[in-house]
Amino acid sequence: MNPKDGAIIQMSFTMTMFPCVKFPQGTKPDYRLTLLTLEDDYQMELSCVKEDNSTVQPTVKMDRNMNSAGEREEILAPSQPMYVVEENFEFITLNINGYDAIIVPKWRGSAGGSTYEFAVDFGTTNTHVEYKVGSGPSKALDITNEHIQMSCLNVDALKNTNILPSIRNNQIPYKLGVDIKFPMRTLLSYKTATDWNQPFWPYITGNMPFYYGSVVNNKFNSLESDLKWNSPEQMVKCFLASIIMLIRNKVLMEGGDLPNTRIVWFYPTSMSMHQLGIISGIWNQLYSDY
């Protein structure tokens, strides 16, 4: 067979990506791409290619289900290397066990320019997020059919009882506002082996577990609940960053005016000035970053 003719090779895996929108000029791109497979002998790598055919290498790669020996912590859960990509790109190149493939995202997003305002109540037990567009009514933060933030290469994977829990526990929700909705428990789900003195990234290291209570947490994750008062600053920042990524994605997907997006957050009068200073500093940093 002439190698130039190509071939069809069957591989058992899927890939998710969010957000599936190109970032406007002046906004720092921030994508999450995840490869998921139940196969033990797959060597998988990806990179992204820009419009000028130059290659974008991921900034970070981490698999929450992989231990220091390179073995899966939870045998029934997939290996799931997740990548951070911080540049716009056109398509993805994928290599599995020496076989190359190209994946072209179906980019979404809308033209617009509407002004969005969000209100975040970071509570001790529950966290609630509402928003309004322009002078419209306020409603709980949602992800609708028209503006789904996450793309899945093989939607049948969303029916796989071994793969689906990892997607629901460690990534943004496919939809938000019906089966799951705000307010939600104030929890951070994170890789148990995390060293919080090292750099961390939302959804790579940890995130708000949107399906908490309806999906069993993965064994390789731990839960932190006392975020508002006694948790390390890095944990609080990771939790809030997982929410602010949802907010930014929503504005971009719906064609909103990102530079003029407003975020209001609340705090109790009983909060000490020291703790208020920490929370305020985290919000200011996240608003600047995103």
Regions found by a protein language model. Give the residues of each.
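Flexible phosphate/Mg2+-sensing switch loops adjacent to catalytic phosphate-binding sites
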Residues: 135-168
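Gly/Thr-rich phosphate-binding beta-strand-loop-beta motif of the actin/hexokinase/Hsp70
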Residues: 109-136
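Short secondary-structure boundary/capping segments
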Residues: 134-138, 144-145, 276-287
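Acidic/polar, low-complexity linker and loop regions
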Residues: 67-111, 289-290
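Active-site neighborhood for divalent-cation/phosphate handling
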Residues: 127, 267-269, 290
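Charged, low-complexity interaction regions that mediate assembly/partner binding
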Residues: 49-76
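Short, solvent-exposed secondary-structure capping/transition elements
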Residues: 129, 136-141, 256-257
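Conserved phosphate-binding loops in N-terminal lobes of ATP-dependent enzymes
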Residues: 1-55, 162-283
